[in-house]
Amino acid sequence: HEYQCLEYAIENSLPIFGACRGMQIIAEYFGSTFKKVENHISSRHKIKITGQSIFKSILNKIENVNSYHNFAIDILGDDLQTVAICSDDNTIEAIQHRDHLIFGQMWHPERENPFNKYNNQLILDFFNG
């Protein structure tokens, strides 16, 4: 059903924001492949912004993110671009679509305690365009 939701949102020009598995679904839908990774379960790491994004100014303020995943993108689908990587091992941590308002990140903003104001701002800016 996830693909049907993506297709509906794309057909109706709705924004799509995916966190963790949500990013993986977006990436898979657009033809990305995955590899197993280590040291990304219940850990934290720094991210490095690598691509252009309308959210770059906010992403640059998010230095350290949580990590709860076993898989990372191996080959990124053609319609997507890398926005951020893990500073430790260069795994892709954030992506966006080249033509549609579709953004994905591997970290969980809802698992931060207290909430990170820059994660909150990223989500607000995304949906308020």
Functional labels for PLM-detected ranges:
Residues H1, S87, Y118-L122:
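Soluble or luminal CAZymes and related metallo-dependent hydrolases
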Residues S53, S57-D99:
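Catalytic beta-strand/loop cores that center a nucleophilic Ser/Cys/Thr
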Residues P109-G129:
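Acyltransferase
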Residues F103-W107:
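Active-site-proximal beta-strand elements of phosphoester/diester hydrolases
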Residues I41-S43, T91, L101:
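A generic structural signal for well-ordered coil/turn residues at beta-strand boundaries
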Residues C20, H69, H108:
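Active-site glycine-centered loops adjacent to acidic/histidine catalytic or metal-binding residues
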Residues H1-I54:
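Cysteine-nucleophile active-site neighborhood
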